[in-house]
A protein has these predicted regions:
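Compositionally biased terminal segments of proteins
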Residues: 1-227
């Protein structure tokens, strides 16, 4: 990853913090695997970042009380407004980063964008995102504090949703990332953390997670889940 991409990410987060909305955001997606290097400091955890996607989850959209023109806030950095999908999901595009906002899907499935009127944006509503926001950690990034899902929730969520990925290579990537994180947690004596997070999942979700782990050679993760 080029240093400039990291610097751009940090500058985006810094501006969102200064505008008063970073506290309402949880960083999700592949950037988590990069930032977890600080959580796993001193452990055998190596990662690289090969994505432009920067996914920002707003767990409680109605909690946002300040009006911020996010597109205008980031315009001088080179971000432009783009649209994706037939429904017109808004994302902020830069040669090095693509920022998309997400919200938890509540109620019936909806393919329509969720309006974030105070931010001048919309968000994609997706299932299972509550699992990422119900157990978070805080890490220092530059001079600011950011929220991310606890690594165990991040990993279990990857296993839960990987089957929904249309491309096989994306499924493999998600599974590899999840197993890698879970193995680091096991090796650092946090097997009970994995077990406790797993038990908060509905039985159907648990079955999906176990199924995705069924073909791995090292059985230690499954043994913890089956304890």
């Amino acid at each position: 990853m080029e240093k400039s991409q990291y610097d751009l990410c940090v500058e985006v987060l810094h501006r969102l913090d200064k505008a008063g909305i970073l506290k309402d955001i949880v960083i999700v997606g592949s950037w988590c695997t990069f930032f977890y290097k600080d959580f796993f400091a001193g452990r055998k955890y190596m990662t690289s970042l090969t994505t432009r996607d920067m996914d920002l989850l707003i767990p409680q959209p109605r909690a946002i009380k300040v009006k911020v023109d996010v597109a205008g806030l980031l315009k001088d950095l080179g971000f432009v407004v783009g649209f994706t999908g037939t429904q017109g999901y808004i994302r902020l595009e830069h040669p090095q980063l693509i920022i998309e906002f997400l919200v938890p899907e509540r109620g019936r499935d909806s393919s329509k964008p969720y309006p974030l009127s105070l931010l001048g944006l919309n968000a994609q509503a997706l299932r299972f995102l509550e699992f990422l926001s119900e157990n978070t950690i805080k890490l220092e990034v530059g001079s600011i504090t950011v929220r991310l899902p606890h690594p165990v929730n991040f990993a279990l969520h990857k296993l839960l949703v990987m089957g929904r990925r249309p491309k096989a290579e994306k499924q493999v990537k998600d599974k590899d990332a999840a197993v890698k994180i879970l193995n680091v947690l096991v090796d650092s004596g946090q097997g009970s953390t994995i077990r406790n997070a797993f038990l908060t999942m509905p039985k159907r979700w648990q079955g999906i997670v176990k199924k995705q782990l069924a073909d791995i050679t090292d059985r230690k993760i499954l043994e913890i889940l089956n304890t």
